[in-house]
A protein has these predicted regions:
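N-terminal amphipathic, basic-rich helices that act as targeting or association modules
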Residues: 1-142, 285-295, 299-324, 616-659, ...
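Long, structured ligand/cofactor-binding scaffold of large enzymes
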Residues: 49-244, 256-259, 363-366, 380-381, ...
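Terminal amphipathic helices with adjacent charged low-complexity linkers/tails
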Residues: 76, 94-149, 277, 282-392, ...
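Mobile "lid/hinge" segments at catalytic clefts and subdomain interfaces of large enzymes
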Residues: 189-334, 425-431, 435-443, 475-590, ...
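Extracellular/luminal Protease-associated
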Residues: 274, 278-285, 513, 736-780
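Acidic, glycine-rich flexible loop/linker segments
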Residues: 556-574, 581, 785-857, 875
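NTP/phosphate- and nucleic-acid-binding module
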Residues: 681-694, 698-729, 737-741, 796, ...
Length: 876
């Protein structure tokens, strides 16, 4: 074991590296540091090797101040978690690296995960069937037919790579499986107890912060580097303390709390910062409540949303069937390291403190387009009418059964909420009371229940609540992300027909964490996040324009009105059900054989070998071009000259706009590519499922049907651009290929919050493969900026107060970016935009290569070439 040996101590049967002893040696009061910073100190303290982690790095973290210096630090997670949408391309890349190593004359076994890596298959199941007892079976059958090639790759990887495990499909959602089973809180490594830390290839990896485990989402490219033993590099963050006081009142849920926190913190601005929760209300928040709050850290913009280890942590570990030895180890270790929170713990120093009173939380939803746009439930009806006119230019008309505001999708989905027994039991109790009063869901509502683990189904069955959910057509449709990530499946044909013919603004209500435009379903423009309890209520109401306080949900068989308050479960009822039916044995039983899979997985045949056998006819898995013509020599980047703008984007362009995860339109470039190869539109599957095929993903870049390219004066959405040399309108992919043929570099112009949303590495990979050399934006979301660097694309930020509009840029200029040759972190570069009439617009931008290692990645053409050269040269 590495580490600063003088701080290694014996505790029982194990050793540890003492954070309090180390901090005291520097005359630093441990209690003054935020808990998350103390965890970072321990992470580096046990990782010091003088090369990847230096003693100076540990000191830099230990000397954290509320306004920290701009200093780069390494982070050495002990685990990596992956889901299959982002995990398949990671495995494809590692397989391609093995091929490249063979071509260089090296040993392919040297390309191997060093860090324990677990992949959970959860992103592929779609809701094709719903509302019946056979929905799960039929959806699973379709999933396996569509994804056989991808699953063969993953099963090959499970056998070919060390330290790599796969949780097969039909088990649960990555973050819930991590919370309920994979996470240890204290991790034994080489006889030394260390903090369980991780990165994940999904932005909601932060959910594990609710268990006191530090971790967050990174791009697939960065995850690969961590898997191969590289640190994750970051700037020492500010830590915003969120003081929680009070107690949730009757009728308010953890979902309402997290939507409020998301609203408050988004307005405050916490991008790139740690958020750490403290205060007396921690005693009243269970780990599932905390996990719900931590899950949505990407939505409020922070790197993480950390809760310290405390008595609630230990209760949850016991309640989920973890070994008593582990629970005791966690308690001893956390107390020895001075990070075990109690109500009497001293308050650390924070960069800023924001207080939130739980007593003020009221029932809420968020929407119709962004998670941070919270609407109190009592104001939703009015808010929807305002949005209808303002956002969609329509006026409400009370016409046929399906109209503006009709709920056509009601989905109990996502690890955000299905991991929380209080809201799941609550949904079951509301369903029970609704059925007992003779209520039903409206016939045009597509209902679904997609638990994040099989434990949920078991306790709903044992409690007798599942039959009531099924009576309202909330049958289990699968164990995966489903509607939350756009795998909502088709709407019934008659519903689709009415929406299209009436050009209707219909709604989805889901218990997920994201509601970006066109994410849930291309025809559903208005999407609201809500607790599972409210999802059931909206399915019964059949519309979002309802005042629940004054309008009935429906009428019983005797014509008596039934209001939401009449069937809303009390906190006492919910607690009683949890205490009776949620037992540790449930978790032990369901996770006993978690890596074995079902009969399909066990019978799935794969060819074994150190290198993967690529199928040239596959439309799912193709060998990527990243290492074509690869050499060990580094060709440093040069200035960009004469670039054209491929895309001019607006504000808040998400990675979902850049690289959609959902359905593939038959008329899109990716759709045409698949049709040319004999794939029927009914077999397209989704973009997310085809991330192992760069040909599909290149064509899918900027192909979201709601993406707007501002090179067009009129509103044009979808995959279109203008090929500037001739003025032709053509697909973004075709234009990029024509520019490439003519040797013309490309850039992208964008507004604020470019690349927000999912940690989607294909948003950067696709951009790079289209030939884009730089993206000039007003601001970048953390993960996407990092991913661009990882793919050798230069993120450039306008100086404060400047943007496309203020500089009067049209996007039709030719651009030079000067000063790249001797680039260094955050260097100011000069941009010259040449107009057709000979005029020049000159302005400065900041190169968002934030750390020295990012400069190295950029010079090598990206993180993968950098790592491959290091491995080949024996430096890793």
């Amino acid at each position: 074991m590495k580490g600063l040996k003088e701080f290694r101590r014996k505790v029982g049967d194990f050793d540890l590296f003492s954070v309090p002893d180390y901090l005291n040696s520097l005359s630093i009061n441990p209690d003054k540091l935020p808990y998350s910073i103390r965890v970072l100190v321990e992470n580096l303290l046990h990782s010091v090797d003088g090369f990847l982690v230096r003693e100076e790095d540990v000191k830099n973290v230990a000397n954290w101040k509320p306004k920290p210096e701009e200093v780069e630090i390494p982070f050495m997670p002990v685990r990596v978690v992956l889901q299959d949408f982002t995990g398949v391309p990671v495995i494809v890349d590692l397989a391609a690296m093995r091929d490249a190593m063979v071509e260089l004359g090296g040993d392919p076994d040297r390309i191997n995960p060093i860090v324990q890596s677990d992949l959970v298959i959860d992103h592929s199941v779609q809701v094709d069937y719903f509302g019946t007892s056979y929905a799960y079976e039929w959806n699973t059958k379709l999933e396996l037919e569509r994804n056989r090639e991808r699953y063969q790759l993953l099963k090959w990887a499970q056998k070919a790579f060390n330290n790599f495990r796969v949780v097969p499909t039909g088990t649960g959602i990555i973050h819930q499986v991590n919370l309920e089973y994979l996470a240890k809180v204290a991790y034994v490594k080489d006889g030394v107890v260390v903090f369980d830390t991780l990165v994940g290839t999904d932005s909601h990896t932060t959910m594990i912060n609710g268990l006191g485990v530090l971790g967050w989402g990174v791009g697939g490219i960065e995850a690969e580097a961590v898997m191969l033993g590289q640190p994750y590099y970051m700037l020492l963050p500010e830590v915003v303390g969120v003081k929680l006081v009070g107690e949730l009142r009757e009728g308010a849920t953890a979902t309402d709390l997290v939507l409020t926190i998301t609203e408050v913190l988004r307005k405050k601005g916490v991008v790139g910062k740690f958020v750490e929760y403290f205060g007396p209300a921690l005693e009243n928040l269970s780990v599932p409540d905390r996990a719900t709050i931590a899950n949505m850290a990407p939505e409020y913009g922070s790197t993480c949303g950390y809760f310290p280890i405390d008595q609630r942590t230990l209760e949850y570990l016991r309640g989920t069937g973890r070994d008593e030895e582990l629970v005791k180890l966690v308690e001893i270790f956390a107390k020895e390291q001075g990070v075990f929170w109690t109500p009497n713990s001293p308050e650390p120093e924070y960069s800023e403190v924001i207080e939130i009173n739980l007593s003020d939380i009221e029932p809420s939803v968020a929407g119709p387009r962004r998670p941070q746009d919270r609407i109190p439930l009592k104001e939703l009806k009015k808010a929807f009418y305002v949005s209808l006119e303002k956002d969609f230019g329509k006026k409400f008309e009370n016409g046929s059964e399906i109209r503006h505001g009709s709920v056509v999708i009601a989905a109990i989905t996502s690890c955000t909420n299905t991991s929380n027994p209080s809201v799941m039991i609550g949904a079951g109790l509301l369903a029970k009371k609704a059925v007992e009063r003779g209520l039903d869901v409206k016939p045009y509502v597509k209902t679904s229940l997609a638990p994040g683990s099989r434990v949920v189904t078991d306790y709903l069955k044992m409690s007798g609540l599942l039959p009531y959910l099924e009576a309202l057509r909330f049958h289990v449709v699968g164990y995966g992300c489903t509607t939350c990530i756009g795998n909502s499946g088709p709407l019934p044909p008659n519903v689709e027909k009415e929406i299209k013919e009436g050009d209707l603004v219909v709604s989805a209500v889901l218990s997920g964490n994201r509601n970006f435009e066109a994410r849930v379903h291309p025809l559903v423009k208005s999407n609201f996040l809500a607790s599972p309890i409210l999802v059931v209520a909206f399915a019964i109401a059949g519309k979002v324009d309802i005042d629940f306080e004054n309008e009935p949900l429906g009428y019983d068989p005797n014509g008596q009105p039934v209001y939401l308050r009449d069937i809303w479960p009390s906190q006492r009822e919910i607690r009683e059900y949890i205490e009776r039916f949620l037992k540790p044995e449930l978790f032990r039983e369901k996770y006993a054989r978690v890596f074995e899979g079902d009969e399909f997985w066990r019978n799935l045949e794969v060819k074994e070998g150190k290198t993967f056998e690529w199928d040239p006819n596959s439309t799912y898995i193709r060998k990527p071009p990243y290492f074509d013509n690869f050499t060990l020599d580094v060709v440093p980047p040069d200035d960009i000259k004469g670039a054209y703008v491929l895309v001019m984007a607006g504000d808040s362009v998400t990675t979902d706009h850049i690289s959609p995860a959902g359905s593939i339109h038959p008329e899109s470039p990716a759709g045409k590519y698949l049709i040319e190869r004999g794939v029927k539109p009914s077999d397209f599957n989704s973009y997310g499922s085809r991330r192992g095929n760069h040909e599909v993903m290149m064509r899918g870049t900027f192909a979201n049907v709601r993406f707007r390219n501002y090179l067009f004066e009129e509103e044009v959405r979808g995959w279109w651009t203008i090929y500037i040399p001739t003025g032709e309108k053509m697909s973004i992919y075709d234009a990029a290929m024509r520019y490439k043929e003519n040797g013309i570099p490309l850039i992208i112009l964008a507004g604020k919050e470019y690349g927000s949303g999912s940690s989607r590495d294909w948003a950067a990979k696709g951009t790079a493969l289209l030939g884009v050399k730089a993206v000039i934006a007003e601001s970048f979301e953390r993960i996407h900026r990092s991913n661009l660097v990882g793919m050798g694309v230069l993120p450039l930020q306008f100086k404060d107060g400047q943007n496309v509009k203020s500089l009067k840029l049209t996007g039709f200029e030719r651009y030079d970016v000067l000063g790249i040759r001797d680039i260094h972190p955050r260097k100011t570069l000069k941009v010259i935009a040449h107009k057709d009439n000979g005029e020049r617009v000159e302005f400065e931008v900041i190169a968002r290569l934030d750390t020295p290692v990012e400069v190295e990645y950029f010079k090598h053409g990206g993180i993968l070439p950098y790592v491959l050269r290091k491995i080949y040269n024996g430096e890793i």
